[in-house]
Structure formats: structure tokens, C-alpha cells
């Protein structure tokens, strides 16, 4: 563990009181600012208090935090409750930033796609509080999601109204995205489309599409932009675009500490200062930094990523041409269209014509995706109906057995039906069972309603069981 800490000490800073101050002083001596992000898997209360302790330091004026850092593992069906709790718990941190002199900055980090709506909702609800209207704060958006430009436009509309009402502008930190593996796993496990762009070039194009939108003067006045990344072509493009449009003062260039430091220094000289993303971790909890380090290794190792060739860029014409061609292909693909997200499941509009049925060979039926607002509304309605549900009661009464003769008749009927079933071919039985599966799918809501009423099943528990029955 000690050897590993020494190997990656330039990427992650020791959060202990006796070492953090010297590290901050060293990183800021050239004029750079720091965005301090506390790594760790401690309970939410500890994460929040430690982040507050960091923000209260005289040498820290900018921190990052995630919704999950204060809510812990949360159930996405309980969207409203999680948002309300996160707002309640995060507000004192924002109040500390607002009451500091000068004001300090809090950046709300984005996690996986399933947290996109929730993070935006928490962010806007915190800053909608009247006593925080003059506080500038930030949020992260990930360009590898097709939904991101629409999310940026949503934030732009909200920020424009905020500024028009005398409030402060906000900041968006634009990144490519670093949770691809988790997005793939999430999609495969539940039978959902993977949320990210299908190719790296499409993600790069989306990054430039969002830069083009964000760096228009009428937008930049409401949202300051953090251009986060190490791709020198993208950095140069953003800088020249901002200068050409007269909004350079509304752009901040951001990089990770310890990554491509020579190139970062050249950019710092050109733009004035960099905002360095500084992960800090308590030495006793160093294991939690492994995930962060793995993501950095992936970025450096994959030939699709710019970082894989950054040290050969100036000396290897082939590497330079490769990156130049990638940049031009992505730039030439930029359009004004607002891409749609990859997931469109909506249980509210499901019917016999569009319910999922495998076209050929067996496929697991997709679970309900609670990251989509239509599905969450559908789930809320189920829970509300479950309080007074009467489903199945009439059927029970109609089929109640009141005598031994009725029981014997039922057994005889079942025996006769079994003989009919036995005469069916395999293909005929399969057709019947496929229809049964379809009918179960069409009655998913009713089944969940009864599960909740009779067994106290939560939506996340019941929904997967309905999917298993369909399969």
C-alpha cells in the first residue's frame, strides 16, 4: 500500500492535516486554482463533514461533491425523497460557501446516467433558495451521453431566468465522461440500451457540439464553462472559439493533477491559469482511490484516447496525424440537431402493440428503468393505488370452493386440461407460453400493485420478479 501511494502520489493528494497544506501550496504556486475532491466510501455523514472541513480551510476555495456522497446508496424509484434529502443535507455546505469572504465554490459532480436528472434537480433546487441566489456554483455534464446537449439547454433556460431575476450565473464543467464500463454493465444487467454514444468519435463530436452551444455570447453570460480535458486539439478549439466570440472571460480550462504536466504548463502560460482537479484521500482509506486510478489507466492505455499518444505527439508524425484526423472527423460531424437519449422505455404508454416481445430466440425482458421520469410517475401511481386496491378480490370470491364435490370437479378439470396440453406439439406449447409472457408483461402494473398491497414488496423488488416470471 505504501509503495502504491508513492507511485501515484502525483495523481492523488494526502488529505491528512499535516500534509494537505504543503501539497496545496505547491500546486498553487504557479497561479493555478484547485478543485478539491474528497475520495472515499465512508458513510454519507462523514463524507459531508469532511468536505465541509476542507471547504472551511483558508487555502481551499473550490470543492467537488456528489449526490451519493450525502445520500449514500439510494433507490431511484424514490427520486423525490432522495432529492429532498440531498438538498436538505447539502444546503449547509452551500451556505458556508456563500458566507465566506470571498465566496467559495462548490461543484456538484455527475455520476452515472441514472443520476443525471437527480443531480440537476438537486443542483437547481439548492440554488433556487432565495438566500443562495447570489452564489455561483457548478455542475458537471458528460459529453459521452447523447442527452447532454438537452440537459445543457435545460440548465441554460433555468440559469437565464435566474440571472434575469438578479441572481448569479452558474458554471458547467464539461467532461467527456469516465463511467463507460459501469454504463455498459448497467445496460446488460437490466436489458436496457447502453446510454453512451456508440463510438468515441460520436462522443467527441458531441463535446464540440456542446462547446459551440455553450460559447455563444447569449449563453455564456448565464453559464460559465469549464473545459475539462487533456486533448490539446479540443483545448485549442475551445480557446480559439471563445476568443473569436469574445467570451474568453467566461471560460476556464481544467485538467487533472499529475497528468501531462508539461502540456498543462504550456496551456497555463497561454490562458493565464488552470483549474486543477485534485483528488484527496485519507491514507487509511487509500484503497478507495483504486477506482479513480483505474479510470486514469484506461484513458492512458486505450489507443482511442488522446492521452495514449500525448508524449509522442511532438515527435511522431503518425501519432499527430492520427489525432488531427480524429479531431477533424469529429468537428466536421457537428450539426445543430439536439440528439435524443438512447432510452425511451415508458411503461405509461405500453400496450399490446409495443410491449417487448423477443423477435426470435430467447431474450430477457427488460426491467423497468427508474431513471426515466415517465416510469417513475408510473411507479408512483402503482404505490398510490396499492393502498386501496381491490384487484383479485372478485376473482377469489368467484372461485371459492365450498364443498368436497367442487374440489373433486376442479381436480377432474385440471386432469382433462393436462391431457389436452399433452397433445400439443412443442411449437404449439411455445406459442401459448409466449402469449402468457406477453399477458404478464401487459399486467406488470397490476401485479406490482398486488405485491405492494399484500406482501409489502417495493417496486425494485417486485419489478424484477415480474420480469423473471415473463422470462
Predicted regions and their residues:
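Positively charged, amphipathic and often flexible ligand-engagement surfaces
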Residues: 1-359
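Terminal low-complexity tails and localization/encapsulation signals of metabolic enzymes
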Residues: 272, 283, 288-438, 442-453, ...
Amino acid at each position: 500500500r505504501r509503495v502504491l501511494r508513492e507511485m501515484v502520489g502525483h495523481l492523488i493528494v494526502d488529505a491528512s492535516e499535516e500534509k494537505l497544506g504543503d501539497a496545496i501550496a505547491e500546486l498553487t504556486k504557479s497561479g493555478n486554482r484547485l478543485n478539491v475532491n474528497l475520495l472515499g466510501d465512508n458513510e454519507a455523514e462523514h463524507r459531508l463533514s469532511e468536505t465541509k472541513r476542507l471547504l472551511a480551510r483558508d487555502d481551499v476555495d473550490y470543492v467537488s461533491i456528489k449526490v451519493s456522497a450525502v445520500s449514500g446508496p439510494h433507490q431511484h424509484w424514490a427520486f423525490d425523497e432522495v432529492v429532498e434529502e440531498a438538498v436538505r443535507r447539502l444546503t449547509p455546505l452551500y451556505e458556508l460557501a456563500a458566507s465566506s469572504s470571498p465566496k467559495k465554490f462548490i461543484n456538484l459532480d455527475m455520476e452515472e446516467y441514472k443520476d443525471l436528472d437527480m443531480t440537476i434537480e438537486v443542483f437547481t433546487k439548492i440554488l433556487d433558495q432565495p438566500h443562495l441566489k447570489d452564489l455561483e456554483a457548478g455542475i458537471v455534464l458528460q459529453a459521452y451521453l447523447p442527452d447532454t446537449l438537452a440537459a445543457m439547454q435545460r440548465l441554460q433556460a433555468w440559469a437565464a431566468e435566474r440571472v434575469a431575476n438578479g441572481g448569479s450565473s452558474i458554471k458547467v464543467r464539461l467532461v467527456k465522461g469516465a463511467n463507460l464500463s459501469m454504463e455498459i454493465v448497467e445496460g446488460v444487467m437490466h436489458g436496457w440500451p447502453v446510454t453512451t454514444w456508440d463510438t468515441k468519435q460520436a462522443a467527441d463530436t458531441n463535446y464540440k457540439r456542446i462547446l459551440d452551444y455553450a460559447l455563444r455570447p447569449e449563453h455564456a453570460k448565464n453559464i460559465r464553462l469549464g473545459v475539462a480535458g487533456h486533448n490539446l486539439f479540443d483545448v485549442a478549439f475551445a480557446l480559439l472559439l471563445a476568443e473569436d466570440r469574445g467570451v474568453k472571460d467566461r471560460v476556464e480550462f481544467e485538467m487533472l493533477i499529475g497528468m501531462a504536466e508539461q502540456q498543462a504548463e504550456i496551456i497555463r502560460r497561454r490562458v493565464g491559469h488552470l483549474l486543477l482537479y485534485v483528488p484527496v484521500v485519507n491514507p487509511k482509506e487509500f484503497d478507495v482511490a483504486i477506482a479513480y486510478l483505474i479510470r486514469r489507466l484506461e484513458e492512458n492505455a486505450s489507443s482511442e484516447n488522446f492521452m495514449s499518444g500525448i508524449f509522442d505527439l511532438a515527435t511522431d508524425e503518425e501519432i499527430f496525424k492520427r489525432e488531427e484526423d480524429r479531431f477533424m472527423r469529429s468537428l466536421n460531424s457537428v450539426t445543430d440537431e439536439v440528439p435524443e437519449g438512447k432510452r425511451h422505455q415508458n411503461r405509461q404508454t405500453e400496450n399490446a402493440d409495443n410491449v417487448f416481445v423477443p423477435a426470435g430466440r430467447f431474450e430477457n425482458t427488460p426491467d423497468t428503468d427508474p431513471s426515466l421520469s415517465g416510469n417513475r410517475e408510473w411507479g408512483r401511481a402503482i404505490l398510490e393505488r396499492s393502498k386501496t386496491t381491490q384487484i383479485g378480490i372478485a376473482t377469489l370470491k368467484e372461485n371459492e370452493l365450498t364443498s368436497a364435490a367442487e374440489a373433486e370437479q376442479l381436480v377432474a378439470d385440471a386432469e382433462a386440461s393436462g391431457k389436452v396440453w399433452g397433445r400439443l406439439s412443442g411449437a404449439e406449447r411455445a406459442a401459448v407460453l409466449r402469449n402468457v409472457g406477453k399477458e404478464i408483461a401487459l399486467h406488470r402494473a397490476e401485479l406490482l400493485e398486488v405485491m405492494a398491497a399484500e406482501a409489502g414488496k417495493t417496486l425494485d423488488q417486485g419489478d424484477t420478479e415480474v420480469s423473471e416470471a415473463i422470462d
